[in-house]
Amino acid sequence: NEKDGIATVIHSGLILSIIIELILLLAYFFFIDDILAILTLEPDVYYIAKYYMLALIIGLSGGLLTFPLRSLTDTVAGTAVSMKIYLLALPINAFLNYCFIYGNFGAPKLGGIGAGVATAITYYILLFIFITIIINNPQFKNLALFNFKFSLKSIKEYLGIGIPNGMGIFMEASLFGFIIIFISKFG
């Protein structure tokens, strides 16, 4: 029943999400060419891998911003809300992959890069759904979520819990992206 602290924790999570996204974008721009050069890919595959990863990194900000909002909905409204939202992600992503990989329904035909674009758009759609639910659900009205509150203590707590969890999630999620790059040299 500590509703006063919820806004501070959510704001801290959103701030950290933005900081992490900026770090990942910088890392991408400084290191992606070196990482891909190690793999000795064919020029076409190199190009696709580079821009596929860029699309994922850009989309990741939507995913990162979703994490604190998901925690909020899980805490206040129960886990069924976020479960339903994430179940929507699969058909949305499949449809967007179909559109952007093959150029259907007016989308540009992007091939492998289209898969990254589709995933990025899916992350932002999920973010939009979470924001819409939080704004329109009466359970969230009394939490003062739009009164910005910053707390260094809250950020330290986030990092203490979040770094180990985040490393695990990052390793799991990036594994799939890197597997695609590694097997690409086999055709």
Mark where each language-model region is.
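Alpha-helical transmembrane segments of multi-pass membrane transport and lipid-handling proteins
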Residues: 12-38
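Alpha-helical transmembrane segments of multi-pass membrane proteins
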Residues: 30, 43-69
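Membrane-interface junctions at transmembrane-helix termini in multi-pass inner-membrane proteins
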Residues: 62-86
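Helix-terminus/linker motif at the lipid-water interface of multi-pass membrane proteins
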Residues: 36-43, 101-110, 170-187
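Transmembrane-helix boundary and interhelical linker motifs in polytopic inner-membrane proteins
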Residues: 1-16, 77-80
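Membrane-interface helix-loop junctions in multi-pass transport and translocation proteins
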Residues: 80, 90-128
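Interhelical loop/hinge segments that connect adjacent transmembrane helices in multipass membrane
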Residues: 112, 116-119, 131-172
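Helix-loop interface residues and adjacent transmembrane-helix termini in multi-pass membrane transporters
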Residues: 3, 75-76, 80, 106-109, ...
